[in-house]
Amino acid sequence: MQGLAPPTSVSIHRHLPARSRARASNSVRFSPRAVSSVPPAECLQAPFHKPVADLPAPSRKPAAIAVPGHAAAPRKAEGGKKQLNLFQRAAAAALDAFEEGFVANVLERPHGLPSTADPAVQIAGNFAPVGERPPVHELPVSGRIPPFIDGVYARNGANPCFDPVAGHHLFDGDGMVHALRIRNGAAESYACRFTETARLRQERAIGRPVFPKAIGELHGHSGIARLALFYARAACGLVDPSAGTGVANAGLVYFNGRLLAMSEDDLPYHVRVADDGDLETVGRYDFDGQLGCAMIAHPKLDPATGELHALSYDVIKRPYLKYFYFRPDGTKSDDVEIPLEQPTMIHDFAITENLVVVPDHQVVFKLQEMLRGGSPVVLDKEKTSRFGVLPKHAADASEMAWVDVPDCFCFHLWNAWEDEATGEVVVIGSCMTPADSIFNESDERLESVLTEIRLDARTGRSTRRAVLPPSQQVNLEVGMVNRNLLGRETRYAYLAVAEPWPKVSGFAKVDLSTGELTKFEYGEGRFGGEPCFVPMDPAAAHPRGEDDGYVLTFVHDERAGTSELLVVNAADMRLEATVQLPSRVPFGFHGTFITGQELEAQAA
């Protein structure tokens, strides 16, 4: 990760070997002022930014602390301390001693952490977690919120509940949803709550983190040891992985009366927005027993049919990839098993009016690399990247057409459509290089280039072009198009300006046909996240103008230590209103807007 703040004379990488320290210090720098500007009421009870040798012994104390003066609402699902029999108490003590004496002291502490697994890097400044916040009402507003905006802006993100005891990647944190209710031109309420996953409930009952962190911990021999330790605890009945191991921290989608919080390592979780603006986790959601596998965090809701299209990938056993969809009433299609030679990281995909577009890129899973001391997430340079084009209602994968797109890795795809004039499928995504830099340390500068990719399924040929001219090239990541036009040709995309990486200094409106770029910049020392486009008429299949709507986004002021919600006119990119939030909102991942009608139609 590159320069997050002006250089300082204090290195946070003192514990790393000299070579790693030099690399990390050149690529990640933090300002003490930015960290100390966090309001003291929200600071963690234990220091978070420690060398691995100084990381705490297994913590009995959650990292996320409620804000004084605002008592946290009771958690119905918490269930208290886990009751253990004599054998389990002995096994727990022995396994804890093995973790501290061998895994931590022998396998981990003699080695430095890469920046991609260093808590001092991954959860510093406004990436650090916050405590839960019960609803706060009647928030101050500057400017005018358009009265048509009626609903809840909800945004997901990673917010570790416990202090890390080993490596930690930003993607490893527990899911927390931040929700802002807007109605009649007023900001009625704000709340943030953990999504009460089975993983989080079990760790709270035990009083410490025990589930493996997929990116931060599972590398090398120590990763194998931590996996073995986890399954030993499961064999002793100390944890139950069958109840779910995911963190539900990435995506949000509203479908069939339910707001679903998702990460690709588990089933979705149903989160309900209460009448007072609070958030309640209903539970792990398997679509009434129809879904028995994990689902990626970016399912696609077709605005015309109401169908929800999804993928599921498996890193251990075949089939490594499956496609399925849900009809508007929630009934599930049969799985289409897509044959892949090796398990592949597929974080996102795209739909058109009639097709599903599936990336098969070079970032793959090779668990055997852990035996060699490496990460199981690997850039396979011998593999040729490709996209698969499959009819939405295909009976099996025999209808899939593959098109090679060499050296292309799109972590996110913003839209796709069918070009009737050429017969090609047009895909809009951000091509990232180095492809594995999010997961593995790299000396190269990360670039995320907004790209138009054209796939000709008849000939197997592809072309690609950068949407922006070289003189205007900026890193564009996380964002969306008008959701009423998803899968159809769109002119505009609203994307975060991810500079200086990994912070977001503003967002851009991009004309996908001309490359014209219009930026909305947050200002010095102010950073945000994903822009959420809210169309003027949420149900309009053909709006008056594609950009007829507003953009909502959270922004944090590092100097003042305050956070806000901005409301920006999507057509002219002018600020309409600012909502002052009662507490800090960390940088997060993806969000959605739930309309007032959808709130009223929520399932119990």
Swiss-Prot record:
Binding site for Fe cation: H298, H347, H412, H590
Disruption phenotype: Plants show a viviparous phenotype.
InterPro entries for the chain: Carotenoid_Oase (IPR004294)
Keywords attached to this entry: Abscisic acid biosynthesis, Chloroplast, Dioxygenase, Iron, Metal-binding, Oxidoreductase, Plastid, Stress response, Transit peptide
Transit peptide: 1-23
Compositionally skewed regions (Basic residues) per UniProt: 12-22
Cofactor: Fe(2+)
Chain intervals for the UniProt region annotation (Disordered): 1-27
GO MF: 9-cis-epoxycarotenoid dioxygenase activity; carotenoid dioxygenase activity; metal ion binding
Domain notes: The N-terminal amphipathic alpha-helix (81-100) is essential, but not sufficient, for the thylakoid membrane targeting.
Family of this protein: Belongs to the carotenoid oxygenase family.
Catalytic activity: a 9-cis-epoxycarotenoid + O2 = a 12'-apo-carotenal + 2-cis,4-trans-xanthoxin; 9-cis-violaxanthin + O2 = (3S,5R,6S)-5,6-epoxy-3-hydroxy-5,6-dihydro-12'-apo-beta-caroten-12'-al + 2-cis,4-trans-xanthoxin; 9'-cis-neoxanthin + O2 = (3S,5R,6R)-3,5-dihydroxy-6,7-didehydro-5,6-dihydro-12'-apo-beta-caroten-12'-al + 2-cis,4-trans-xanthoxin
GO cellular component: chloroplast stroma
Protein's job: Has a 11,12(11',12') 9-cis epoxycarotenoid cleavage activity. Catalyzes the first step of abscisic-acid biosynthesis from carotenoids. Not active on the all-trans isomers of violaxanthin and neoxanthin. Contributes probably to abscisic acid synthesis for the induction of seed dormancy.
Cofactor note: Binds 1 Fe(2+) ion per subunit.
Induction per the UniProt record: By drought stress.
Gene that produces this protein: VP14
UniProt-recorded name of the protein: 9-cis-epoxycarotenoid dioxygenase 1, chloroplastic
Organism whose genome encodes this protein: Zea mays
Main localisation: plastid
